[in-house]
A protein has these predicted regions:
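Post-HExxH zinc-binding segment in Zn-dependent metallohydrolases
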Residues: 1-22, 199-228
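Long amphipathic alpha-helical segments used for membrane anchoring, targeting, substrate engagement
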Residues: 1-81
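Active-site recognition of the HExxH zinc-binding catalytic motif
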Residues: 105, 148, 167-183, 213-214, ...
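Catalytic Zn2+-binding segment of zinc metalloproteases
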Residues: 176-191, 225
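Catalytic zinc-binding patch centered on the HExxH motif and its immediate surroundings
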Residues: 123-149
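Short pre-active-site segment immediately N-terminal to the catalytic Zn-binding motif
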Residues: 152-170, 201-207
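Pan-zinc metallopeptidase signature
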Residues: 248-292
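Short helix/loop segments within enzyme catalytic domains
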Residues: 88, 92-117, 204, 208-253
C-alpha cells in the first residue's frame, strides 16, 4: 500500500501499555451480553478474530444474548497508565488507513461522522462493557468507537496465514463498515429483526450484516486514493485481503476447530461468501451494491 507521506487521522486513542481491569467481564444471562464464551469454546482463545465482532456489535445493542459475555458493569473499572507499546509502523498504518476511510466516506455519504479508533492491549473499558483482546477487533455502537489490540495482526499473519498491510487495512475497513451501518440505522433494524427471529434466522440476519461490512471494505479499497490521486492499493494488495477473508470464513474455521461444518450456525458467512462480498465491493466501487 502507498502509505508513505499520507495524512493520519486524529480520531485515534492509544491505550496500549495501560493495565485495565473490569469487574463486569464474564457473566451470564444478561440480554446485553454477547456470545463470547460460546465462540471461544468453539474456536479457541485468540482464534476468534473477526468472528466475534458481529456478536459484539449486535448484542451490545441488546441482540441475541446468550450464555454470557462482555457485559456493561456498574462496578468500578480501572486503568493504570503505562508507556505505549504501539510500534510506530502499526500506529501509522492504523491512522493512515483510518484517515483514508474518513476521506472517502465523507465524500460518499456527505454527512459522515467519523468513528474513533482505540488501540489497546489485553482489555479496555468501552461503552458496551469491558472489551477483551480475545474478542478480536470490534465496534461498539454505544460510543461509536473501533477497538483493536495490535497483537491481533500477528495472529492474523501467523495463525491464519494472512499477512500484509492490506490484510490489516481490510480489518479496519470492515469495522468502519459497521460504523456506517450504525449511522444509517442498519444495526438497529437488524437488532429488531433478530428480536422476532429464531436462532437460525437470527444467525442469517447477522451473516448479512457482516457481509455488508465486508462489501463496504471492498468499496473503500476500490476508491482509496493517495494525496496525489494514485490508488492507495498496489499490485497484490487486494489479494492479501481476499486471503484474510477466506481464512476467517465460518466454514473454514469450523473445519479447523471441530472437523464439521454447521451452516445454520454461521454468523459471518462462509469463506466463499466473505470473499465474494469483499470482491463485490471492490469490483463495483459502489456502496449501493452492498445489499444482502
Amino acid at each position: 500500500m502507498r502509505l508513505g507521506g499520507e495524512p493520519e487521522s486524529s480520531n485515534f486513542e492509544d491505550r496500549t501499555g495501560q493495565s485495565s481491569s473490569g469487574f463486569g467481564g464474564m457473566g451470564g444471562g444478561n440480554a446485553l451480553g454477547c456470545l463470547l464464551p460460546l465462540v471461544m469454546s468453539r474456536f479457541g482463545l485468540g482464534g476468534v478474530v473477526l468472528l466475534v465482532v458481529g456478536y459484539f456489535v449486535l448484542n451490545s445493542l441488546g441482540g441475541l444474548g446468550g450464555t454470557g459475555g462482555i457485559l456493561p458493569s456498574d462496578k468500578p473499572q480501572s486503568a493504570t497508565a503505562g508507556q505505549s507499546t504501539l510500534s510506530p509502523e502499526i500506529r501509522r498504518l492504523l491512522t493512515v488507513v483510518l484517515g483514508d476511510t474518513e476521506e472517502y466516506w465523507g465524500k460518499a455519504l456527505g454527512n459522515y461522522r467519523p468513528t474513533t479508533m482505540v488501540a489497546y492491549t489485553g482489555g479496555t473499558q468501552t461503552a458496551c462493557g469491558f472489551g477483551q483482546a480475545a474478542a478480536g477487533p470490534f465496534y461498539c455502537p454505544n460510543d461509536q468507537k473501533i477497538y483493536i489490540d495490535p497483537d491481533f495482526f500477528n495472529e492474523l499473519a501467523r495463525r491464519f496465514q494472512a499477512p500484509g498491510d492490506f490484510a490489516m487495512a481490510y480489518v479496519i475497513a470492515h469495522e468502519v463498515g459497521h460504523h456506517i451501518q450504525n449511522l444509517q440505522g442498519m444495526l438497529d433494524r437488524a437488532h429488531q429483526a433478530q428480536a422476532r427471529a429464531s436462532r437460525t434466522e437470527g444467525n442469517a440476519i447477522q451473516v448479512r450484516v457482516e457481509l455488508q461490512a465486508d462489501c463496504y471494505a471492498g468499496v473503500w479499497a476500490k476508491n482509496a486514493k493517495t494525496s496525489a490521486g494514485q490508488p492507495l492499493l498496489e499490485s497484490g494488495d487486494f489479494e492479501e485481503g481476499m486471503r484474510a477473508a477466506e481464512a476467517i470464513g465460518d466454514d473454514t474455521l469450523q473445519k479447523q476447530s471441530q472437523g464439521v461444518v454447521v451452516p445454520d450456525s454461521f454468523t459471518h458467512g462462509s469463506s466463499a461468501q466473505r470473499m465474494a462480498a469483499l470482491r463485490r465491493g471492490y469490483d463495483t466501487g459502489n456502496p449501493a451494491a452492498c445489499t444482502f
